[in-house]
Amino acid sequence: MTTEPAPPAPPGVSRRHVLRGLGAATGVAAVAATGLLSYRAYDAAVLDPGGGDAHAPWRDWRAVPGPLGAVGAAVLAASPHNTQPWRFAVADDAIDVLADPTRGTGSVDPFSRERDVGLGCALENLVLACPPRGLSPTVTLLPGGDPVARVALTPGPAVTHPLYDVIDRRHTDRGPFRATPLAPATLEALSGADPAVHWVVDTAARAALGRLLVDAAEALVADTEQSVDNFAWFRATHDDEERHRDGLVLDGQGFGPLQLGAAKLLPPSSRAEGDRFWVDRTRDVHVATAAAYGVVTTPADTDDRAAHLEAGRLLQRVHLRATSLGIALHPMNQITERLDREATTGTASDLGPRLAALLPAGTRPLLVFRVGVPVRPARPTPRRPVAAVVA
């Protein structure tokens, strides 16, 4: 849920020069001059963002009845780097949620905390999607192994929770936000007044957290192993999206139409270019336009899978509430990714103490996100179909 890819650039040309100096429209014109624009536009799906089979799960899930329909909602949940680290064992009377050990991010998530948060997000969507199908869900967390959770199903009245109606409108928004402050009552509504969500709104605290996020991004890309593990989930082309149906894609980066078109038409970028662009984007767009930050915390003495699963369920609810209110949300986990990396390498920096100074005493940070009023709607990103995730 952290690193975003860079818009590609021609060999020897900086993407910052292409998309900022020349402008996106100029970038498109430059490619058009080669005589290949029509084919490249078709091949890169420039004219049909969000189309193709990789996006079909967003369109098809509501019409599917029973437990498989609920799984169809689950696969639309948020996950780290869009890894979709889930599998499901489906029966008429229960759905088991399982972790897929092949879909991790390595050194970026060495303790699998982010993976478990993603599983919690899927679990929340699954639970929301059962009642409209006449199924009453009862959740039992099984944090000691696999499955990680079981949802028992019994017949019940067909009722719809308001959050169910926005499941297919919820998308991570990495674009700019408007300079519109969010009222305290709005933030409380987003979190459901859950004390596990700590809001960072004060100007000084928000600036301090913004600097932390930029510093953590710089540290992450300077760590070769983390940089490589991040970039492994970048799907550089439309063909990559259709083949993998997961990962970080250009449609999910919050670009305007012309900028997105230019990015898709230009050749794929290198890892080093992508790293540099992400740091720049973090500083110049994400931090610069955040109206507020939320930090999902656990008690300082609690760091287990059950807590991570519940945090994922909470994050999914916050994001769905935000969607229902026209508010954008963007997870930014580079600080905790660096803290976990330091724990595995035996190193230390000032990131931990600086973040702790912004949080209530006795809490442990699990994930950070920014919120704000979006400049433009976020686009859907690829999803694997239900058939690919049912064990």
Can you annotate each of these PLM segments?
Residues 2-391:
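Acidic, surface-exposed loops and disordered segments
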